[in-house]
UniProtKB/Swiss-Prot annotation:
<comment type="similarity">
    <text>Belongs to the UPF0246 family.</text>
</comment>
<dbReference type="Pfam" id="PF03883">
    <property type="entry name" value="H2O2_YaaD"/>
</dbReference>
<dbReference type="InterPro" id="IPR005583">
    <property type="entry name" value="YaaA"/>
</dbReference>
<dbReference type="GO" id="GO:0005829">
    <property type="term" value="C:cytosol"/>
</dbReference>
<protein>
    <recommendedName>
        <fullName>UPF0246 protein Swit_4565</fullName>
    </recommendedName>
</protein>
<dbReference type="GO" id="GO:0033194">
    <property type="term" value="P:response to hydroperoxide"/>
</dbReference>
Length: 253
């Protein structure tokens, strides 16, 4: 079983790291080629493509201009957005991190598919960006079936046929455009109970995705049915609103 997460825009390349054995991304060459192509874009062009401030655009233009010289850090510790606040990797023990390496995957516009301990350089490139190197119109075209093929290979290696989707729609589309055959896909839907009824809280859902990934690693869950026991931060599985392909979890407090 593999659980998929989105990456994060926020990065942390300064906090101390625990002792760990980092790994190399499988699509490192593709990432370098894309970064080199992005280095040819002006900061102004990057700002327009990514919808970011001039300051952020200049920062990322500089990163791409010297991409090979940028510091590397394991993906799980480099990303620091809401999902990774929920995951809180720095407080997990070594066996749980090892389990994450085997059972968690992070989707990426630049790197395609990452294991938690794969080394990455700082970047900003959302999967939905309407740009790609060469004659491709966007990153979905660039990646094609590569991400799904890699997921299928990883699942085959562990003798499993289940993907737990805790990624955003933007990133999940990179898999769903060419879904791996013969694989059961379960999408997690996180809601909150409010006075006006059930609501979708984007911030809360992102944190919940990370918390579920952490909970899975802490409890060494390898059967999706075990995830129905997820109870972090007041969440509980709800049969109402769930079906075979979508499982709803509701936060009641």
């Amino acid at each position: 079983m593999l659980l998929l997460l989105s990456p994060a825009k926020s990065l942390d390349y300064t906090s101390p790291l625990p002792p760990l054995e980092a790994t190399a991304p499988r699509f490192a060459e593709e990432a370098l080629a894309t970064a080199q192509a992005a280095a040819k874009l002006s900061a102004r062009k990057l700002a327009g493509l990514m919808g970011i401030s001039d300051k952020l655009a200049k920062l990322n233009a500089g990163r791409y201009a010297d991409f090979a010289g940028q510091e590397e850090r394991p993906a799980l510790y480099a990303f620091s957005g809401d999902v990774y606040v929920g995951f809180e990797a720095k407080t997990l023990d070594e066996p749980a991190i090892g389990f994450a390496q085997d059972h968690v995957r992070i989707l990426s516009g630049l790197y395609g598919l990452l294991r938690p301990l794969d080394l990455i350089r700082p970047y900003r490139l959302e999967m939905g960006t309407r740009w790609a190197p060469g004659r491709k119109k966007n990153l979905y075209q660039l990646w094609g079936s590569k991400i799904s093929d890699a997921l299928a290979a990883d699942l085959l290696g562990e003798g499993s046929d289940v993907i737990v989707n805790c990624a955003s729609k933007e990133y999940w589309h990179a898999v769903d455009q060419a879904p791996p055959k013969g694989i059961r896909i379960i999408t997690m839907d996180f809601r909150e109970l409010a006075p006006q009824g059930l609501i979708f809280n984007s911030f809360g859902a992102k944190r919940a995705r990370g918390m579920m990934a952490r909970w899975m690693c802490e409890h060494r869950i390898t059967d999706p049915e075990g995830l129905k026991g997820f109870d972090s931060d007041g969440y509980a599985y709800s049969a109402e609103g769930s079906d075979d392909s979508t499982w709803r979890f509701v936060k009641t407090r």
